[in-house]
Amino acid sequence: MGEEAPEFRVESVALESKDCLQNAIDIGDKTYVISRSDDPKSSITIKILDKLTQTWVVPTVLGAPPNPTSSHSAVLVNNEKILIIEKGVPLNDSIWFLEVDTPFVKQQSKIKGTVVVAWSKGVIGEGQKPIVISGPSGVGKGTLIAKLMKEYPSKFGFSVSHTTRAPREKEIDGVHYHFTERSKIEEEISEGKFLEFAHVHGNVYGTSVEAVESVTDEGKRCILDIDVQGARSVRASSLEAIFIFVCPPSFEELEKRLRARGTETEEQIQKRLRNARAELDQSNSPGLFDHLLVNDDLEACYENLKKLLSLDDDHEDSNDSFIKDGKETACYSILSKTNSEILLQSETNEAEKGTTNLLSLDLSLSGGAPGRTRGLKISPVN
């Protein structure tokens, strides 16, 4: 139930008062009011005015909000999300999106039976696509991944999975797993915060969106070593990734490798073979995997994997250069918007550190809540 609106109309402009700064954005028959008090430690609040019924609604807010600052500027993007630029914050930390009518928000609203909005941090540049590697037990995918990590330690990283099981001896929370309560992981799964999950021996295991995003934030490509069912779940999510299936030259060769381990009983081997046959059958599902790698010879397979990942290509995105040059340390606010771009104006003295006074923000977006919104392109306006 909403509360009756007071007898005043909120316009689609920034409203400043002694106590707060508000941005009111009209989208159809609703006005989204984004408010904060002038206390820099306060968080942003969201209220929605239904203009047809003149009632206020306080939505369920998903995702972590921007860090508290004194003020912000805002503008509507694609009629489905609101771009927020935090004032007084370096550019690379100041860009946020409040999703109000995206597919993710619509899905969550349907699940929860209430009005939902969601925060997503904006990131300049695309970032490297994560890599999903699947394959039956014994095919050698673990060895291939280990070789990648050894040769390119600064380029690749693993996401840390979540589990509800108790830590084993010498296991460290946040290093081996994120150990969590069942109620919490189930709640986050329902909120779409997990790319994939499975119930194993009474416990829940899963890969969260944040675990993958945090690796990308470090400038590395995240590797997900998951089974075919997990790969199917990731493919169905909003995450843009490269999907690779590693297969044996023949089923007989796979059985030979499993038996050569000498670490499992006949019953365990037969179970692994049954699972392997099912995974090999599923690997041919249309649209599931981008590449199939046959691991007949380990070194040859590894070289083919590196070619797939274009590891010899040292191309640098112009946005990466912009960030590395330190130009993102200046503070900006929204000046104007056109159909294809948003102009940002520097709040820093133009003579300081060679700061560019005007920047063009091209909104070629990818991703979004519950993860980051990537693909923002920045260029100076001469």
Curated annotation (Swiss-Prot):
First-tier enzyme category under EC: transferase
Function of the protein: Essential for recycling GMP and indirectly, cGMP.
Family recorded in the similarity comment: Belongs to the guanylate kinase family.
Catalytic activity from the UniProt record: GMP + ATP = GDP + ADP
Pfam families: Guanylate_kin
A GO molecular-function descriptor: guanylate kinase activity
Record's protein name: Guanylate kinase 1
Species, as recorded: Oryza sativa subsp. japonica
Localization: Cytoplasm; Nucleus
Keyword field contains Kinase: yes
